Amino acid sequence: MRVVFFGTPEFALPSLQILLQPQSPFEVVGLVCQPDRPQGRGQKVLPPPTKVLAQAHGIPVWQPVRLRRDPQVLAALEALAADVFVVVAYGQILPLTVLQMPKLGCVNVHGSLLPAYRGAAPIQWAIANGETETGVTTMLMDEGMDTGAILLQAKLPIGPEQTSLELAPQLAQLGAELLVETLLKLEKGELTPIPQDGSRATYAPLLKKQDFHLDWQRPAQALHNQIRAFSPNCFTGIEGQRIKIVRSASPQLHSPPPEIPQGSPGEVVGLARGEGIYVATGEGSLLIRRAQLPGKKEQSAWDLVNGGQLKVGMRFEPLPNS
C-alpha cells in the first residue's frame, strides 16, 4: 500500500514509525509537514521531528507554507499515485483536490473519541474539562474540521493527576496501532464508515494565553484540571511577580488536614511537609507541588518554602493585563 504521510509534531512520530517498520506492508512514498520553525528559548530554527525521521529513511519531504496555494506540491502529490493519505497532526486543512487524490481516501488519526473534542487541542481540553476517559479515532476525512466518518476508535483512561504531556505519548502510540488496523481493514473492504452525530460534537480550540491564567475563585478541582491540562504554562501573580504553577495534587486524593483554615481564595493557608503548599480556592484547598519563578528553573513548592519565597499568609492574585 502506497502511503503519503501528512504530520508534523512529536504526536505524529509513532504513526510514521510504525508504517516504516521492517517488513511493513506499507510503502511511505512521501511526507508533507509544516515548515521548519524557531523553537525553544533560543528560537533556533529546527525541522519537525517527522521530517528528521523521513529524511533518515530517504523519503521525499514537502513543507508548503500553504498547501492549497502551492501548485508544485499539489502536482507532486498527484504524481505519487498513492493508495491512501495518512494525516496525523499535520497543522493545515487539506483542500478538496487533495482529499480526492488517493484511491482509498485520506485517513486521519485524531486524539479524542469523536465527535467529542473536534479541533486543535483535544488532549488538553479533555483534561481541563475533567474527563476520566479519552481515546483516539481514525476517520475518513472530509472538508470539515474533524467531521469525517468514523472508521475505528480505541479508549484510554485519564489518571486523576495525569498531565497532557504524560497523556499525549500514550495516545500517540495507541493511535499508531489503531492506524495500522484501520489501513489493513480499509484495504480489504472490512470497514463501514460511520457518520458522526453532529449534535453530540464538542470542541477543543487552539490554546490562548487567557486559558493559562489561574482564577482562584474557581473550585480546587477545576484549577487542578486546568494546571495538569496546560502544564507547564499556567500562571498567577504573587507579590507583583508572575509565578508558574506547574504541578498540583488531586483534591480528591489529597485533602488538607483539618487544622488548616479555609482562608480566602488565593491565600496560602498551610504547608504539606516535603510536598508543597495548600492554597485556598473558591471551593476547597489545592495542594501545589511544583512551581517556577521568573528567570528560575521549575522546582518543588517545598523548596520554595524552604527558600523563603513561599510562606503561609501570602496570596496568589491576578496579574494586571494577564
UniProtKB/Swiss-Prot annotation:
The keyword Heme does not apply. (6S)-5,6,7,8-tetrahydrofolate binds at residues 112-115. InterPro entries: Fmt, Formyl_trans_C, Formyl_transf_N, Formyl_transf_N_sf, Formyl_transferase-like_C_sf, GART_AS, Met-tRNA-FMT_C, Met-tRNA-FMT_N. GO terms for cellular component: cytosol. The keyword Amino-acid biosynthesis does not apply. Its EC number is 2.1.2.9. It comes from the Bacteria. It catalyses: L-methionyl-tRNA(fMet) + (6R)-10-formyltetrahydrofolate = N-formyl-L-methionyl-tRNA(fMet) + (6S)-5,6,7,8-tetrahydrofolate + H(+). Transmembrane segments: none annotated. Keywords: Protein biosynthesis, Transferase. GO terms for molecular function: methionyl-tRNA formyltransferase activity. Attaches a formyl group to the free amino group of methionyl-tRNA(fMet). The formyl group appears to play a dual role in the initiator identity of N-formylmethionyl-tRNA by promoting its recognition by IF2 and preventing the misappropriation of this tRNA by the elongation apparatus. Belongs to the Fmt family. PANTHER family: METHIONYL-TRNA FORMYLTRANSFERASE, METHIONYL-TRNA FORMYLTRANSFERASE, MITOCHONDRIAL. This is Methionyl-tRNA formyltransferase. It comes from Synechococcus sp. (strain JA-2-3B'a(2-13)).
